[in-house]
Swiss-Prot record:
Its main location: plastid. Usually encoded in the trnK tRNA gene intron. Probably assists in splicing its own and other chloroplast group II introns. The lineage of its organism: Eukaryota, Viridiplantae, Streptophyta, Embryophyta, Tracheophyta. This is Maturase K. GO terms for biological process: mRNA processing; RNA splicing; tRNA processing.
Length: 510
């Protein structure tokens, strides 16, 4: 972000959140499409796959002149000959929407940079906290002492205007809001990315950056209010009773906010819900988890509070079936490709005292995580590595590659899956996945050389594709000391890597 801060006049545009003039700045397109500025994408002599800043300006003007703006993308037939290029509307409409997404992301990045620079002497570097695997050590530390959990499917806006209204609180530029409406209403199936993974619209495919920004901003808006409640309730619990005037003043400010939150008449009731007891909240994508040490009655209050909160403040209708109340000791959490649960492990210890012996039974709670094998095998089958029953098959589309490239591709997939699912308490599932990939690789190579798998493996020997099974030992040898008993043997416990920032494609079946 530093390399283009000098191009942007913060005092004029960004202080007032005026974004529309930046759409006509050529350097913005350069940063959005070519961060290294090695080549220019905006060329005046634009062809079918080239872009011209002048044409972009004309397109925006043409959009506003249309009585029915849906005519631009009404169909993708051969009749679409705007400016003499087939699908040119689609092309320029796409680039404007992507650059618009790049522009609205800049203020958040600048705020993050300024915040880190102002506190860099006080804040310890915590890049590992950005890893999605950091959630599971949190589970292991906190969930052993909790009773109930709410599994929440975050509702999505039923109308596009809700997203626009949310942005109005910080985007004061009316022209940008109008342009955003053009983008949103153009893609009528915009919410298929949330409601269905099978049918992905043009919007989610070609304008995923803009869509994800809008959806994340929508979720962040409601989470910011949620975190505000939690922080204030925590502050009240830690404040001594003697500071009565400060508490009265604080409650006065809370009552003032009743106008902002019209779904309740008594703000103290909301605060009580957060104080007794304090909940733990995590989220990834469209699913969140709220865990508490409270009773079943309290969790039901949480459930209907969230439903009313979404409906009254964000105009979102959420059915009660989208929030599940489960007891941690009897239920497994389905989260980020893992089944997580709290298990009770019993151990019997024999104690000898003089002539008497006693058997002491100890029960300890353990946070257990296992891999969701059926969806993972389904993902492998969808990628044509095996059939629906898990039997390995050859990857026919890779038979034209070199042998080394085929082995590297299979090995990369295997390493990524092993890396992501290394936190599993049971390793047998990973062995099965490795077996599928190993045999699929052998079948692919045998098909390429027009040989049988048995003859191919016999010719290469037992060392063929040994990296499929030795990758974890290689990683552990770098992490653990050489003289460690764990390093000398094969460690079967969970390992969470804090360098994973997203779910691998084959691991993402949600």
């Amino acid at each position: 972000m530093k390399e283009f801060q000098r191009y942007i006049e913060l005092d004029r545009s960004w202080q007032h959140n005026f974004f529309y003039p930046l759409i006509f700045q050529e350097y913005i397109y350069g940063f959005a499409y070519d961060p290294d500025l090695k080549k220019s994408i905006l060329l005046e002599n634009a062809g079918d796959k080239k872009y011209s800043l002048l044409i972009v300006k004309r397109l925006i003007t043409r959009m506003y002149q249309q009585q029915n703006h849906l005519i631009l993308f009404a169909n993708h037939s051969n009749q679409n000959d705007f400016w003499g290029h087939k699908h040119t509307n689609n092309l320029y409409y796409q680039i404007i929407s992507e650059v618009f997404a790049f522009i609205v992301e800049i203020p958040f990045s600048l705020l993050l940079i300024s915040s880190l620079e102002s506190k860099k002497r006080k804040i310890v570097k915590s890049h590992n906290l950005r890893s999605i695997h950091s959630i599971f050590p949190f589970f292991e530390d906190k969930f052993l002492h909790l009773n109930y959990v709410l599994e929440i499917l975050i509702p999505y806006p039923i109308h596009l205007e809700i997203l626009v209204q949310t942005l109005r609180y910080w985007m004061k530029d009316a022209s940008s809001l109008h342009l955003l409406r053009f983008f949103l209403y153009e893609y009528r199936n915009w919410n298929s990315l949330i409601t269905s993974q099978k049918s992905i619209s043009i919007f989610s495919k070609r304008n995923k950056r803009l869509f994800l920004f809008l959806y994340n901003f929508h979720v962040c808006e409601y989470e910011s209010i949620f975190v505000f409640f939690c922080n204030q309730s925590s502050h009240l619990r830690s404040t001594s009773f003697g500071v009565l005037l400060e508490r009265i003043y604080f409650y006065g400010k809370l009552e003032y906010l009743v106008k902002v939150f019209p779904f309740t008449k008594d703000f103290r009731l909301i605060l009580w819900l957060f104080k007794e007891p304090f909940p733990h909240y995590v989220r990834y994508r469209g699913k969140s988890i709220l865990a508490s040490k409270g009773t079943s009655l309290l969790m039901h209050k949480w459930k209907y509070y969230l439903i009313n909160f979404w409906q009254c403040y964000f105009s979102l209708w959420s059915q009660p079936t989208r929030i599940y109340i489960n007891q941690l000791s009897k239920h497994s959490l389905d989260f980020m490709g893992f089944f997580s649960s709290v298990q009770l492990n019993s151990s019997v210890v024999r104690s000898q005292m003089v002539e008497n012996s006693f058997l002491i039974e100890n029960t300890m709670k353990k946070f257990d995580t296992i891999v969701r094998i059926i969806p993972l095998v389904g993902s492998l089958a969808k990628a044509n590595f095996c059939n629906v029953l898990g039997h390995p098959i050859s990857k026919s589309v890779w038979t034209d590659l070199l042998d080394s490239d085929i082995i590297d591709r299979f090995g990369c997939i295997c390493r990524n899956l092993s890396h992501y699912y290394s936190g599993s308490s049971r390793k047998k599932t990973l062995y099965r996945i490795k077996y599928i990939l190993r045999l699929s690789c052998a079948r692919t190579l045998a098909r390429k050389h027009k040989s049988t798998v048995r003859a191919f493996l016999k010719r290469l020997g037992s060392e063929f594709l040994e990296e499929f099974f030795t990758e974890e030992e290689k990683v552990l040898s770098l992490i653990l000391p050489r003289d460690s008993s764990i390093a000398r043997g094969f460690y079967r416990g969970p390992i969470w890597y804090l360098d994973i920032i997203c779910i691998h494609d084959l691991a993402n079946d949600e």
